Amino acid sequence: AEAVAVNAAHETAVMVAPFEGEAGFAGLLADARRNALLIGPGAGVGEATRACVHAALTAPSAPSVVLDADALTSFAGDSATLAALISARARPVVITPHEGEFARLFRGHDEVLGAVGKLARARTAAQALGAVVILKGPDTVVAAPDGRATIGCDLPPTLATAGSGDTLAGFVCGLLAQGMPAFEAASAAVWLHGACARALGPGLIAEDLANALPRILQSGDLIANA
């Protein structure tokens, strides 16, 4: 509820819907129009966030789900529980960890953390969870449970700014909401994220990335690099 008030105060184009507790969140999920959901940024680490993730992954409306930041850290060392929730659903799940969040989530999972190389770790994690994994960094890897993978090369160092990863997760969620398959949505979001940063240049902040997206979508660069 606190985050809703903050966002409502300065994002006039965003519709907000406050809720309290698990019952309130379940009420939001009951609306089938909410076909894609992002949980994590600013959510806080703990049981309340775990409960929201559980509710989202078991909701009868079965939205596509993106998990980032605090949603992942709330399952630190307990990736098996998350995998069990994901395996019981048909709709896609995408997780978007940076290296620290990845290591916390898969703590104790030697098969994942012991895989040699970032590509192998992302692929092993995707297979273990049954989710698309975006393992962020200057060479962001997108891996699907079926073994497909893409690598975002030459991503600008200007993306290493607070909130940039949250914006990427939002890009993924937006593409999922439009019906794009999960692996393709994740790969496209990584490319768009980098393209926005390249267009903006030095000095960008996270809010700039979303504002730059329409220009990138309308540009010839999108067609040339498709």
PLM regions and their residue ranges:
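Gly/Ser/Thr-rich beta-alpha loop segments that engage phosphate groups in nucleotides
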Residues: 42-46, 139, 165-168, 172, ...
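Charged C-terminal helix
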Residues: 10, 195-226
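Glycine-rich phosphate/dinucleotide-binding loop and adjoining beta-alpha-beta core of small-molecule
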Residues: 1-154, 222-226
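Short, small-residue alpha-helix embedded
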Residues: 104-107, 161-192
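Short, well-structured alpha-helical segments that form the helix of a local strand-helix-strand
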Residues: 118-126, 182-195, 206-214
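Amphipathic alpha-helical interaction elements
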Residues: 110, 177, 198-201
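Alpha-helical transmembrane segments in multi-pass membrane proteins
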Residues: 36, 40-42, 161, 169, ...
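Short pre-catalytic strand/loop immediately N-terminal to key active-site residues, enriched for Gly-Thr
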Residues: 151-163
